[in-house]
Swiss-Prot record:
Its main location: membrane. Disruption phenotype: Larval lethal. Larval development is delayed due to decreased food intake and reduced systematic insulin signaling. However, escapers eventually attain a normal size during the pupal and adult stages. Unlike in wild-type larvae, mutants do not develop a preference for zinc supplemented food or eat more when fed a zinc rich diet. The copper cell region of the larval midgut displays developmental and functional defects such as reduced luminal acidity, increased bacterial titers and enlarged cell volume. The interstitial cells also display increased cell volume due to reduced basal infolding. It is found in: Apical cell membrane; Cell projection, Microvillus membrane; Late endosome membrane; Lysosome membrane. Belongs to the ligand-gated ion channel (TC 1.A.9) family. This is pH-sensitive chloride channel 2. InterPro entries: GABAA/Glycine_rcpt, Neur_chan_lig-bd, Neur_chan_lig-bd_sf, Neur_channel, Neuro-gated_channel_TM_sf, Neuro_actylchol_rec, Neurotrans-gated_channel_TM, Neurotransmitter_ion_chnl_CS. Coiled coil: none annotated. GO terms for biological process: cellular response to zinc ion; chloride transmembrane transport; positive regulation of insulin-like growth factor receptor signaling pathway; positive regulation of TORC1 signaling; regulation of renal water transport. Residues 1-18 form the signal peptide. The gene is pHCl-2. The name 'hodor' is an acronym for 'hold on, don't rush', referring to the developmental delay phenotype in mutants. One of its GO terms (molecular function) is excitatory extracellular ligand-gated monoatomic ion channel activity. Residues 19-300, 348-360 are extracellular. Ligand and pH-gated channel that mediates chloride transport primarily in the mid-gut and thereby functions in larval metabolism and fluid homeostasis. Channel opening is triggered by zinc binding or, to a lesser extent, an increase in extracellular pH. Zinc-dependent activity in the mid-gut is required for modulating Tor-dependent metabolic programs that promote larval feeding and systematic growth. It may therefore act as an intestinal zinc sensor that mediates larval growth and metabolism in response to micronutrient availability.
C-alpha cells in the first residue's frame, strides 16, 4: 500500500466520523489505490479498520504479456522471478502419463589437451569442455515468444539465476575453471526450456597404471563424473548418443599414443557402511570414460635395449682372448657389467617403485646373468689353464671332456686307498734292489732314486704311489682286483681351456637369441 492510499484513507475516516459519510463510498474510492480492506463502520459506536498490507509481487507475479517488446534481461528476470522459479529446487519432469520421473542430464566431453602423464605420481592433466544438457520446463518461453527460435545465452551471471546440477569428478586431485578476465562458462536456454551449460575446465586426475609390461605397457586412464546431491530418484546422468567423448585433432602426447576411448554409465550405492556422499544415502548416477593409451617405445629401444644388447655382445669378446690374459679379460668383464648396471639405473628412475616384476626388470636380470656368466667362464678356464696334469679321456667328445674337467684324478687315487700326505725324508743315500725272477731266470734290478730331505708335493707323492701300485705284486687282494681304466686320448689343460672358449663363442650368442625370441614374443603376443 502506497502513501497516497494511506493519506486518502485517513482523510475519509476523518470526514466520515465528523459528517457521517457512508463507508461504501470510501471503499469505492480506495479500490484503485491498493489492496486495502476497510471493515464496515458504525457511526454511533467506535469503529475499527483492518488493513491488509501485502506485497504485490507475492499476490501478483510480473506479467509476461507483450514479451516480444521486452529486453532479454527483463524477460529473464520475469521468468526467474521467485513467484515462478525457485533456483534451489530441481525441476519436476513428468512423462506422457503425467507421472513424475527423474530428470535426465546428458553430458558430452571435448578434450583439448592431455599432458603430464606422470608414471611416478599416477596422474595426468586434462583440459576440456564439459557440456550438460537437461530440460527445465519452468524456463520455457516459446508461448511468450512464439517467433523466437534462437536460445537466450549468457555467462556466469545467467548461470547464477538458474538451478544447475552439481556434478563432480570423483578421481580429481585438483580442478579449476579456465578463463582470463572471466570464467569460461556459457549457459543457453532454448524456447522449450532446454538448458545447455558449457564449462571449459582443467583437472588433474588420478590414474592407476599397471607397469608389468613396462616399457611396452598399455594404460587405461579413467575419468568419472557423478551426481553429488541428488540420487537416482531425482537425477540420472547419461552420455549423449552422438560423440559423447571426442578429442582435438591436434592432440598429441609426448610418451603415449592415443588409440581410443570407452564410455560407461553405472550406479554407485551410498549407505552407512560406504559413505561416498557424506550423510546422504541412496543410489547415485555415474558416467565415466576411459582413455586407452600405448607407450611410445622408440625412446626405450634406442636408449636402453639396443645399448644393452651391444654391452652384452661386447662381454663375449673375452672368449676370443687367451685364458691366461687375466688383466684384459677381467677388465672387460667388470667394465661391461658396471656399464650395463649404470644404464639400467638411469631407466628405472623413470618408473614408480612397484612390488611386482616388470618386463624391463626381466631384461635387466637376464642381461646381467649373461655378462656375469662370461666372467665366471673366464675364472673357470683360467683355473684349468694353470693345471699341470693332462686329462686322460676315453673319447675326445664334449661329454668326456666336461666329465674329466670337473672330476679330476682325485677319484682314482681315492679308489686305490691312498691318502695324500706330505712326506719328509732325511738326507740319505740308499740303493734298494728288488730281485724278481723272470720266466728265463733273469734277475730284474730296480734302483730307487735318492730323495734328499725335502717335502714332496701332494701331486708328486700321489703319482709316485700310483706307479708303485701298478708294478707291485704284494698289494692286498681288494686293490689288486681293480684295473685302471683304459685311456685313448689325452688333452693338455691349455687345450681344454681353448676348447671351452670355442664352445662358449656359440653357446652364449645362441642362448641370447633364444631369450630374445621368447622375450619379444611375450611382449607383443600376451
Amino acid at each position: 500500500m502506497d502513501t497516497l492510499g494511506i493519506f486518502v484513507l485517513i482523510s475519509y475516516l476523518g470526514l466520515s466520523s465528523a459528517a457521517g459519510v457512508h463507508l461504501g463510498d470510501l471503499q469505492q474510492n480506495l479500490a484503485a489505490n491498493g489492496s486495502v480492506v476497510v471493515s464496515p463502520l458504525n457511526t454511533t459506536d467506535a469503529f475499527s479498520v483492518s488493513i491488509n498490507l501485502s506485497q504485490s509481487t507475492v499476490n501478483n507475479c510480473p506479467s509476461l504479456k507483450n514479451a516480444e517488446s521486452m529486453a532479454l534481461m527483463e524477460l529473464l528476470t520475469r521468468l526467474t522471478a521467485p513467484c515462478r522459479y525457485d533456483r534451489m529446487v530441481p525441476p519436476v519432469v513428468h512423462n506422457k502419463d503425467g507421472e513424475e520421473v527423474p530428470m535426465d542430464i546428458y553430458a558430452r566431453f571435448y578434450i583439448y589437451v592431455m599432458k603430464n602423464l606422470d608414471s611416478s605420481d599416477l596422474q595426468f592433466t586434462v583440459q576440456g569442455l564439459l557440456q550438460l544438457r537437461y530440460l527445465d520446463p519452468r524456463l520455457a518461453f516459446s508461448s511468450y515468444l512464439p517467433n523466437r527460435r534462437q536460445p537466450i545465452m549468457g555467462e556466469s551471471e545467467l548461470k547464477k539465476m538458474l538451478w544447475v546440477p552439481h556434478i563432480f569428478l570423483t578421481n580429481e586431485q585438483a580442478s579449476t575453471v579456465l578463463g582470463t578476465s572471466a570464467k569460461d562458462e556459457l549457459t543457453s536456454i532454448y524456447p522449450n526450456g532446454t538448458v545447455l551449460t558449457s564449462t571449459r575446465l582443467q583437472a588433474t586426475l588420478y590414474c592407476w597404471m599397471n607397469f608389468q609390461k613396462f616399457p611396452f605397457d598399455e594404460q587405461k586412464c579413467k575419468t568419472t563424473l557423478e551426481s553429488w546431491m541428488y540420487n537416482t530418484t531425482l537425477v540420472q546422468l547419461h552420455w549423449e548418443t552422438d560423440n559423447p567423448v571426442s578429442f582435438d585433432k591436434q592432440l598429441q602426447l609426448t610418451e603415449y599414443n592415443l588409440i581410443g576411448s570407452l564410455y560407461n554409465e553405472s550406479i554407485r550405492v551410498s549407505n552407512e557402511s560406504y559413505m561416498s556422499h557424506g550423510s546422504l544415502e541412496g543410489n547415485y548416477s555415474i558416467i565415466s570414460f576411459t582413455v586407452l593409451l600405448t607407450r611410445e617405445v622408440g625412446y626405450y629401444v634406442i636408449d636402453y635395449f639396443l645399448p644393452s644388447i651391444m654391452i652384452v655382445t661386447i662381454s663375449w669378446v673375452s672368449f676370443w682372448l687367451q685364458a691366461d690374459q687375466t688383466p684384459a679379460r677381467t677388465t672387460l668383464g667388470c667394465t661391461t657389467l658396471l656399464s650395463f648396471i649404470t644404464l639400467s639405473l638411469s631407466q628405472e628412475n623413470n618408473l614408480m617403485k612397484v612390488s611386482y616384476v616388470t618386463m624391463s626388470e626381466v631384461w635387466f636380470l637376464v642381461c646381467t646373468i649373461f655378462i656375469f656368466g662370461s666372467l665366471v667362464e673366464f675364472a673357470f678356464v683360467n683355473t684349468i689353464w694353470r693345471r699341470n696334469n693332462d686329462l686322460q679321456l676315453k673319447k675326445r667328445t664334449t661329454k668326456y671332456i666336461v666329465k674329466s674337467t670337473f672330476v679330476p684324478h682325485l677319484k682314482k687315487h681315492r679308489r686305490h686307498g691312498y691318502r695324500r700326505t706330505d712326506s719328509t725324508m732325511s738326507t740319505m743315500s740308499t740303493t734298494s734292489m728288488d730281485k724278481t725272477c723272470g720266466p728265463n731266470n733273469t734277475v730284474i734290478t730296480i734302483e730307487t732314486p735318492i730323495i734328499i730331505g725335502g717335502s714332496l708335493s701332494r701331486e708328486d707323492s700321489a703319482i709316485s704311489l700310483d706307479e708303485q701300485d701298478e708294478t707291485s705284486t704284494s698289494e692286498s687282494s681288494d686293490s689288486s682286483k681293480e684295473k685302471p681304466a683304459q685311456t685313448f686320448a689325452t688333452m693338455t689343460p691349455k687345450e681344454v681351456s681353448l676348447w671351452i672358449d670355442r664352445k662358449m663363442r656359440f653357446v652364449f650368442p645362441l642362448s641370447f637369441i633364444v631369450f630374445n625370441a621368447l622375450f619379444w614374443t611375450l611382449v607383443y603376443c600376451l
